[in-house]
């Protein structure tokens, strides 16, 4: 199948969803050689991947993933982005996920270690004391108790190992760079997705809709970042459950002042984790506008996610209110408490008495954690 698919792609012909699912299935089942995998990925990129091809590939990955049970799935959300923008920013989507969980969202965070940056979501969470490669039941328990859990992509998508070598040797973006946000093993109902190139906003939003996501917002910010920009415009494609619409977001729509995006510059896992800890402890991360840049970016992402979770029609006029909720979670200790519970649950052995653990964690208050980083 893959040999014929390479020929078709080289001739400029798109594959159907079913054909694409068959080819990706062949790759993931170990039925293709490294040369065939590399040739197919490059032929696809040269042609340009279609929405049907993206959906077919994601469907094949989803069907082979280790399933993840997500409590309260009707409130479930993920902030996993594509990465690969080369900007080296702080882990904004991870901080936003904590803010959403603190505001009552049910977060099943999908992610991996860094590919093009120095620190991916898995790296910073590990530095924050989260056990990132937990078994599915451990992740489910974390979602249930803390409101947030982490699905480590290599753990839940073991079959992608067959494409890892060719992807690394190619050293360029391929369709697999788009598939992370589309293959959350918890099958969340809502998503905020940052993409590395504006041209992917509408196709990824359409693909999410085709895969059964109820609501999603796909964003690409000024300066080429896969986040909502803290200065300038952000292009967004929104899937509302029926159609994809395009719009422009600005900090002013959230009632945020524009700040210097240089404040979003990140470092290695220890550096980024330190910044997240200080934000959640209500401490300044300076210098200059750094604190406001990190807080604005994460709170805007969280606000957009919280609006996706609202019943009824999406109302962008509510974004300032959602932003206030998200910022409050960062400053009143709520998100810090979520992180503490997550740390405890993720490290607890499988089989531990969940009733006792939950009761103990329920007794911890944000006030008791005040001043602790």
Residue ranges and their predicted role:
Residues 114-130:
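Active-site-proximal loop->helix
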Residues 34, 87-94, 115, 292-297:
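Short, conserved micro-motifs enriched in small and acidic residues
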Residues 1-13, 79-82, 87, 371:
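N-terminal basic/disordered segments at the start of proteins
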Residues 8, 14, 63-66, 89, ...:
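Glycine-rich anion-binding loops and their surrounding alpha/beta cores
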Residues 81-86, 111-117, 156, 222-223:
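Acidic, glycine-rich active-site loops and adjacent beta-strand->loop/helix elements
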Residues 1, 9-55, 63-70, 297, ...:
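N-terminal glycine-rich anion-binding loops that anchor highly charged ligand groups
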């Amino acid at each position: 199948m893959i040999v014929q698919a390479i020929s078709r792609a080289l001739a400029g012909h798109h594959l159907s969803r079913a054909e694409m699912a068959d080819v990706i299935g062949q790759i993931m089942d170990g039925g293709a050689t490294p040369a065939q995998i590399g040739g197919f990925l490059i032929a696809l990129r040269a042609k340009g991947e279609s929405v049907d091809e993206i959906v077919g590939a994601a469907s094949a990955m989803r069907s082979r993933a280790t399933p993840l049970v997500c409590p309260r799935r009707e409130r479930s959300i993920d902030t996993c982005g594509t990465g690969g923008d080369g900007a080296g920013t702080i882990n904004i989507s991870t901080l936003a996920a904590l803010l959403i969980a603190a505001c009552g969202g049910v977060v099943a965070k999908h992610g991996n270690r860094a590919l093009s940056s120095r620190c991916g979501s898995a790296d910073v969470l590990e530095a924050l004391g989260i056990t990132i490669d937990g078994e599915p039941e451990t992740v489910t328990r974390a979602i249930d108790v803390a409101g947030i859990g982490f699905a480590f992509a290599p753990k839940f998508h073991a079959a992608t190992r067959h494409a890892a070598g060719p992807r690394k040797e190619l050293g360029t973006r391929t369709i697999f760079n788009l598939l992370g946000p589309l293959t959350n093993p918890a099958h969340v109902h809502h998503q905020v997705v940052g993409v590395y190139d504006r041209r992917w906003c509408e196709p990824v939003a359409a693909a999410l809709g085709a895969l059964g996501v109820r609501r999603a917002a796909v964003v690409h910010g000024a300066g080429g970042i896969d986040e909502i920009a803290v200065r300038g415009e952000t292009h967004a494609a929104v899937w509302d459950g029926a159609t994809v619409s395009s719009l422009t977001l600005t900090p002013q729509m959230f009632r945020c002042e524009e700040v210097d995006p240089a404040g979003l510059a990140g470092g290695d896992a220890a550096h980024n984790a330190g910044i997240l800890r200080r934000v959640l402890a209500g401490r300044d991360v300076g210098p200059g506008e750094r604190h406001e840049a990190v807080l604005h970016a994460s709170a805007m992402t969280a606000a957009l996610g919280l609006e996706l979770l609202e019943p009824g029609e999406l109302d962008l006029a509510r974004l300032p209110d959602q932003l206030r909720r998200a910022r409050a979670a960062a400053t009143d200790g709520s998100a810090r408490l979520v992180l503490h519970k997550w740390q405890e649950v993720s490290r607890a052995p499988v089989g531990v008495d969940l009733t006792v653990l939950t009761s103990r964690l329920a007794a911890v208050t944000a006030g008791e954690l005040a001043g602790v980083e």
